[in-house]
Structure formats: C-alpha cells, structure tokens
Amino acid sequence: MASNHKSSAPRPISRGGIGLTGRPPSGIRPPSGNVRVATAMPPTTARPGSRGGPLGTGGVLSSQIKVADRPVTQQGLSGMKTGMKGPQRQILDKSYYLGLLRSKISELTTEINKLQKEIEMYNQENSVYLSYEKRAETLAVEIKDFQGQLADYNMLVDKLNTNTEMEEVMSDYNMLKAQNDRETQSMDVIFTERQAKEKQIRSVEEEVEQEKQAADGIIKNMSPEKQVKYIEMKTTNEKLLQELDTLQQQLDSLNMKKESLETEIAHSQVKQEAVLLYEKLYELESHRDQMIAEDKSMGSPMEERERLLKQVKEDNQEIASMERQLTDIKEKINQFSEEIRQLDMDLEEHQGEMNQKYKELKKREENMDAFIETFEETKNQELERKAQIEASIITLLEHCSRNINRMKQISSITNQELKMMQDDLSFKSTEMQKSQTTARNLTSDSQRLQLDLQKMELLESKMTEEQQSLKNKIKQMTADLETYSDLAALKSSAEEKKKKLHQERTVLSTHRNAFKKIMEKLTSDYDTLKRQLQDNETHAQLTNLERKWQHLEQNNFVMKEFIATKSQESDYQPVIKNVMKQIAEYNKTIMDALHNASRS
C-alpha cells in the first residue's frame, strides 16, 4: 500500500517539465479539475510523481522548492496549504519536521557516543588509579618491612662496632623477643577483656532498657493521679539533682579555698594563733548562746512537770501504736504467706510480672521477718527509755519541789533588798563587759607586741651575723697587712715562683710537642681506620642496623603510648558505676510504684 511505502532519503529538487525521479510538489493542483489523483492505487500502476512512473507534465512553478521528505498518510498523499504563492516557497509539512527530528537525533547520538567514550576513559583512569593505589599500599608495606630490616642491620653494626659478643647479641634478641611476646600476650588479654567488658556493658544496657520498658509499662498502667504524682516527683528529683550538682561545685570550691587558706596559715605563726583564738571565741559564744537558750527554754516548775507528763503520755501512745502496728504486720505476714503459697502454685504458669511480684513479696517477707526478729530488742530499748524518762521525771519533780521551796524563801525578801540585788547585778554585768573589752584590748596589744618582738629578734640576729662577718674581715685584713709589710720576702717568693713556672713551661712545651706528634700519628691511624671502616660492608650493615634499631625503639614507644591510650579508653569502671546507680534508681522507683499500687 501507499501508506507503507516510505522514502528513506531526502526528496530531490524537481522542476516542472523535467523528467526526474521525483514527485511533483504536493501543493500543486492537477491540470484538470475533473481528474483526481488516486490515493489507493494498486501496486502495478504507478502514481504520478512517484518512483514507479514518469514525472507528470506540469509547469506550474518555475523555481526550485526544497522538500524535506514526502508526507505519507493512510489515504495516500495530501498537499499542505501554503499561505502565499510564488517562487521560493518552502513547505513545512510532516516530512520536514521528521527530517529535522532525525538530524537532532543523530546529533544526540553522536553526543551520547562522545559522552560514553569519556565515561569509558574515566573508568579506565579510575581503574588505573585504584591499581596504583593498591600498588602504593603494597609498596608502603614493603618500605616498612625494609625499614625494620634496616633498623636491625643498624643495630647489628652498632654491636660490631662496640665489639659485642654473639652471645650477648643472642641474649638481647631473646630478651626482646620474650618482651615482645609478653606485650603481645598482654595486648591480647587486654583486647579480650575489652571485648568481654563491652559485651557485659551491652548486656547491662539491654537489662537497663528492659527495666526502663518495664517501668514505662508500670507507669502507663498507673492511674492518672499517680502518673501526675510520678511526673511531679520526677521533676522534683531532677531539680534536686541539679541543686546537688551546684552544691557539690560550691563544696569543691570551698574545699579548695579551705586548703589554700590552711597552706597560707601553716606558714604564719601569727595566723595560727589568731585561728586558735577565733576557735576559742566561737566555742565560748556557742556555749553562751546555749546557756541563754536553756535559760529561756526553762519555764516554771509546773510547766516542766506538765511537759514531762505530756512526754510520758506521748511515749505511751507511741508504744501502743507500735503494738498495733505489730499486730497489723503479723496479719499482713499471714496474708502474704497465703499469697506466696498461691504464687508458688501459679509460678510455672505465669512468668514475667507475676515472677517480679513474687520477688517483691519475698523481699517484703524478709523485711518483715527481720522486723519481727528485732522487735523484742526494740521493745526492750523502748522500755529502758521509758524507765529513764520516769527516773528523769522523778528527779525533775524533786527539783521542782526544791525550786518551790526556794521561791517561798525568795518571796520573803523585801522589795528594797530585791532592788539592791538588781543594782548589784547590773553593776556586775557592766563590770563584766568592761573586763571583756579590756581583755580584748589586751589580746590585741599582746599580738601587736609579739609581732614587734619578732621583728626585733630578727633585727638582732641580722646585726649579730653582720658583726661576726665584720670581725672575720678585720682578721683577714690584719693577716694581709702582716704579709704585705715584708716586701723583700714577697719579692724573693715571687722570683722563686717565676723560676718554677719557667721550668714547668719548658717541661710542658716538650710534652706538648711529643703529644702533638702522637696525636698526628693517631689522627692518621684514625683516618685510615675510618676509610677502611667506611669501605667495609659489615660497617654499612651495622650502621643500617643501628638506624633500624632506633626505628624499632620509636615504634615501641608509639605502641606503648597506644596501649596506654587504649587502656584508658577501655576503663569501664565509671560506666559500670553509672549503670548500677541508674539500675538502683529504677528499681527503687518501681518498688515505690508497686508499693503505692498495693496500698491503693
């Protein structure tokens, strides 16, 4: 069919009247209005303007028209209507856009191929880079091995230079090997311990997480009032912890300040005495305040008697309440024993929360047993306390009776005598205040005079030392004057000393020349030995071994530092303490919650 017959190449430029293998433009009408070009001709008949037949006669257009491709539809060919007629008209039909699309597709294909080549080149470069990197790593390992061998050779050269025997070298080697083996074993032990501790920490963290989940479950199962109370207690706990941190910081700062003050006081005798006096003053003031408070708290004998009777009644009520609590506790023990038996029966069926409740009840039972065991002792203590209180009541009653008799005697005193006694008391109090101020003034004067005395003693010691030094100088100058007064003896001794020094100079010059010759000979021998040693391969190996030994020493030091840092990193004691503290807090919170739940 005509719709399946497409031209793969662009259409040639055609002219009217020229017998080319192209079809006429689709926009040209046929010469006759009665004749219509068939759109669905059989394959045997050729269409006008197609490859199968000659070009139709038409001289409608005298100019060339460029057509990209022939439009093909299901019903054959259809021309495009143009907006204007005339020469050089371009038809932008479907074939034009298809050709344009093909050109763009070819450009995109070339660009994609170009990018694909660049990607392949990049991948090749990347693979080469990876191979180079691997090769560099292997070469670095080889260099490290060679450095180790070089250090060994340097150490060997050093041993040869120092004329070390082979047995000593082997003993050093064995010692280093044993030390390295021990350090390797210790590192392995530390590593295994660290793994075990990390595993233990993970298990503890899991247990803590489980306890947290259990606590969250208990909190969720609480009533809203208890949840609100729990949240309030939690916030209060956080606030108290913050206050504890701040108070701890303040305590640390005060302790540091105290230590600095103590060190400052330790170097000063006057400050130590002042501290002792302040402590004594503080004790006296506290004793005075205590006596004043006791005097104020002491009432009349009747009030004391009533207070003691009230205290006896309160103690009796407390003993009765304790007995009632004891009976209640016994009833609770029986009840809990029944619950424990029931829990023992249901323990195999119900695990988890029931097991936890069983443990709590078991613990509560142990606490109650301990209370019952210590009840007799506490009871005896309370009875002894009661007897002591009764004895004190009796003594106070006797004291009250004596005071009453004394008050009766005092009541017989006249107002004039009482006024005289009050005046005497005020006079004595003023005298006491004056004596206290005098004592304070005398204390300050004593301290000031002690300071002056210390200064005077210091000056006296300095003057004594200076006087002694001046006496020594006078003695030395007197001896020098006696020596320098005899000039003839000084000249003769100087001449003798000069002759002796000349003789020593000549002897030392001869020795110097001899030693110079010996030194030149030794220097030449040293140079020859040095050249021989430099040419010797063993010396070169020993030098290399010495360098390798230094490298090993450096590596050993680095490994020791690494082991020390890892040991510090693997210190798990603070973590364990923190975890155990949190576990104890969570357990306490859960116990309190369960206790409140059981009460409610």
Swiss-Prot record:
GO terms for molecular function: beta-tubulin binding; chromatin binding. Predominantly expressed in testis, but also detected in other organs containing cilia-bearing cells, including lung, brain and kidney (at protein level). Residues 1-90 are annotated as: Basic region. InterPro entries: IFT74 (IPR029602). It comes from the Eukaryota. Gene3D superfamilies: 1.10.287.1490. One of its GO terms (biological process) is negative regulation of epithelial cell proliferation. Residues 50-59 have a biased composition (Gly residues). Residues 1-64 are annotated as: Disordered. It is found in: Cell projection, Cilium; Cytoplasmic vesicle; Cell projection, Cilium, Flagellum; Cytoplasmic vesicle, Secretory vesicle, Acrosome. Residues 22-33 have a biased composition (Low complexity). Residues 97-390 form a coiled coil. Its main location: other. GO terms for cellular component: acrosomal vesicle; centrosome; cilium; intraciliary transport particle B; motile cilium; nucleus. The modification Omega-N-methylarginine is found at R51. Keywords: Cell projection, Cilium, Cilium biogenesis/degradation, Coiled coil, Cytoplasmic vesicle, Developmental protein, Flagellum, Methylation, Phosphoprotein. The modification Phosphothreonine is found at T73. Component of the IFT complex B, at least composed of IFT20, IFT22, IFT25, IFT27, IFT46, IFT52, TRAF3IP1/IFT54, IFT57, IFT74, IFT80, IFT81, and IFT88. Interacts with IFT81; the interaction is direct: within the IFT complex B, IFT74 and IFT81 mediate the transport of tubulin within the cilium. Interacts (via basic region) with beta-tubulin (via acidic region); interaction is direct. Interacts with ARL13B and IFT88. Interacts (via the IFT74/IFT81 heterodimer) with RABL2B. Interacts with IFT57 and IFT70B. Component of the intraflagellar transport (IFT) complex B: together with IFT81, forms a tubulin-binding module that specifically mediates transport of tubulin within the cilium. Binds beta-tubulin via its basic region. Required for ciliogenesis. Essential for flagellogenesis during spermatogenesis. Belongs to the IFT74 family. This is Intraflagellar transport protein 74 homolog. It comes from Mus musculus.
